[in-house]
Amino acid sequence: MGDVAQRIRVTGVVQGVGFRPFVWHLAQELSLSGWVRNDALGVDILAQGADEQVQALIARLRSEAPPLARVEAVEAATTTPSAHCSGFAIAPSVDGAVATAIGVDVGVCPDCLGELFNPNGRRWRHAFITCTHCGPRFTVTTGLPYDRSRTTLAPFALCPDCQAEHPHAADRRFHAAPTCC
């Protein structure tokens, strides 16, 4: 049987909470192609692959969201599969009339606390430690969709080490907008 494609809309508190990296990881696990991006309504996903795998993605978006996310709705619509769709990417955000919410600031998570007090780590005693699971969201956001370019951190370039973490899928700071050093 051939591939199917679904356009999936996720609404709620789904920006600034590690939702795009979460979707990316699920897509890799399920061998799906397509993309995920933030937009003015929440998160927009194109998922293409075996029907069983696409349906598994939709179910898991509802049941396994990141801890800071609050999924209000997951809506899917069938679309035409593309022969040119390969791999799964975090696509650039799309602007529009804002109808989504941003998460609240969250205290430091246990993993970041471990780094904060590790004298051998590069984030030892770093006052602005954060990852996709903790740190500032609301107080640094200047606009939506939520991306680093729409935070108060936008004028500050990432150092080479932080820049290397940002696109690295296995890292807690994968696409974490408030990362800084």
At which residue positions do the language-model features occur?
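Intrinsically disordered, low-complexity, mixed-charge
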Residues: 1-179
